Amino acid sequence: MDLGNSGNDSVVTKFVLLGLTETAALQPILFVIFLLAYVTTIGGTLSILAAILMETKLHSPMYFFLGNLSLPDVGCVSVTVPAMLSHFISNDRSIPYKACLSELFFFHLLAGADCFLLTIMAYDRYLAICQSLTYSSRMSWGIQQALVGMSCVFSFTNALTQTVALSPLNFCGPNVINHFYCDLPQPFQLSCSSVHLNGQLLFVAAAFMGVAPLVLITVSYAHVAAAVLRIRSAEGRKKAFSTCSSHLTVVGIFYGTGVFSYTRLGSVESSDKDKGIGILNTVISPMLNPLIYWTSLLDVGCISHCSSDAGVSPGPPVQSSLCCLQFTALLSPPPGWGGLSPLNSHGL
């Protein structure tokens, strides 16, 4: 245990992450597996972004939000996996206290953005299918940017609040965390200070960023399902369902793992179940998301060929913002991105 002295108390200056396993024979195998998972996630996500930028059929609000959703997926896996890989090939599994706080902040920042963007995408599907006549005015370019900006502000506020609330806690006993990355509520179990306020803040965050978005997503898709079932055309029903099925799959994986993780606040100690759920939440889910959305893109025939349609007036440059990060396409301004191109008159 690495301790520093402050007066008569021993203060923890580092934590020790036990990681996935302490079995030396398994570590090289796990290193290769998670390295491949990391490369697959980065490659798949960049492919999705490239397709959205270059294919005019994808210049609709739904894929604008998908492009923004891809960024926190890359961020989440980049916050956790590289450090885990280094632990597989190093005997030093310690992490400085401040580095632990930084990891926790960025993870909650990116995971929070995921929560809000998934909710926005459900609302977008509701407008596109249930309010199609007014969709273009209700989901204008300005509104798209405002929604993404709000998701950044809310997720940043929550991440900063949780991190600032954790920083004054005293850790004067064991410093071993039975996990492979720093996240709540594991540090609570090691604190020799009261964590009552921290528990309340985490509960409020879970309600605001977990329960409320999940309720909104459920209500949105209840209306969508009712509207789709009223469509007489089999092709129309298939197209509507295809634009929603991939998103519902991602929502199920994301919230399924998140609910399990943050309902274990009362557990006495971390278990291997927490590590398994952590792997699903931080590695498997971001890796599957590009594969799921690629399947959806293929289903709607958006990736099979480059659009050859002409005569569409150019809109604003392709811009995507997430948590104050923006990228601008090094291409000519795409047709119709400001609202909807003729190929996406109903956001589909």
From Swiss-Prot:
One of its GO terms (biological process) is signal transduction. Glycans are attached at N8. SUPFAM superfamilies: Family A G protein-coupled receptor-like. One of its GO terms (molecular function) is G protein-coupled receptor activity. The chain crosses the membrane at residues 29-52, 61-82, 104-123, 144-161, 200-222, 240-262, 276-295. Odorant receptor. Its main location: membrane. Keywords: Cell membrane, Disulfide bond, G-protein coupled receptor, Glycoprotein, Membrane, Olfaction, Receptor, Sensory transduction, Transducer, Transmembrane, Transmembrane helix. Disulfide bonds join C100-C192. Residues 1-28, 83-103, 162-199, 263-275 are extracellular. The keyword Transport does not apply. Residues 53-60, 124-143, 223-239, 296-348 are cytoplasmic. PROSITE patterns: G_PROTEIN_RECEP_F1_1, G_PROTEIN_RECEP_F1_2. It is a multi-pass membrane protein. This is Putative olfactory receptor 3A4. The gene is OR3A4P.
